[in-house]
């Protein structure tokens, strides 16, 4: 801790904010678009850390809010998709994050791919 907070990069600031939240030993960790504003390297580093953190049996339950399915960390078990302020679909992640559901929610033909432990989508 030999640097002032204001001199940290966005990725470093996000890690500090998450670390501060964890100091209170919460039962639930709510992450609202934690990768917003990060470059590709910062995003991937943070997602890797989330995946490692979530695999710890002592870690609190986590809710991650994102607009980009490629930002869903590996190890995520459930998903909920909102549309027009309500729940469009929820359940086990592989049943929720599908081409059919994403196309319906965005009212645009979408292709969802699952590669390794990550999801990717594109408009058709």
List the model feature ranges, each with a label.
Residues 72-74:
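A short, surface-exposed alpha-helical micro-motif characterized by mixed small hydrophobic
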Residues 66-67:
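H-loop/switch region of ABC-family ATPase nucleotide-binding domains
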